[in-house]
Amino acid sequence: MKQWLKDAVFYEIYPQSFYDTNGDGIGDLEGIIEKLDYIKELGCNALWINPCFDSPFKDAGYDVRDYKLIAPRYGTNADAKALFEAAHAKDIHVLLDLVPGHTSEEHAWFKESSKPEKNEYSDRYIWTDSCFSAGDGMPFIGGETDRNGTYILNFFKCQPALNYGYGKCREKWQMPTDAPGPRATVEAVKDVMRFWLDMGCDGFRVDMASSLVKNDTHHKKYTCAIWRDIAAMLDKEYPEAALLLSLIHISEP
């Protein structure tokens, strides 16, 4: 564990309801910057910022439309960079909430994945091989895209599940975790992490970290392997970055 994390006292912020600086009735990143002294006086030395990426907000920001863009209601990417810098000047670390299990149906990846023509994103999400196929026990949506298939959901209709593969494949449209499609999804998540770490954030709290691989073992063998892979990348490239995974315990391989 990182030394700073051992001594961290977190203040959790849902930006929308925290502090509004422009009078639109919605909290924003500038509001967090203005209240850093207040947070410091409370004895907190770390922030956990709930979902703040671009989203249609059908599920409070847990339906991400663009992982590399701050939601306009909260500000801009420049505001995020300013927040990281202002927090660091006061010895406060900042974690962003990352939702890697699914995206919004409005995400550019999903729009490409929904096309009938094979492309880079065809396997970014979990699709059956026919618009009449059920989801092998999982919730699914069919008949809403040009692609001949139904797509698997994680929660609501607006949240198509990203494809990290299956621990046990029971249908021909299911892919093992080491197939090119699932591996590309993992690399895409690493790319998102690098983007924000390079901007100055100190790591991520990961929502529903156990939900990545479908038909996983009881102890989440395959999902844990993905997180060990991502953690190894962080340890190598960003040794001070924190990775806090919700609802999962990574056991030894």
Q: Which residue ranges define each predicted feature?
A:
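Structured alpha-helical segments in the cores of large, soluble enzyme domains
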Residues: V189-C201
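Conserved small/polar residues in nucleotide/adenosyl-binding loops
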Residues: I248-P253
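Acidic/aromatic-lined carbohydrate-recognition and catalytic surfaces
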Residues: K2-E187, D198, A209-L247
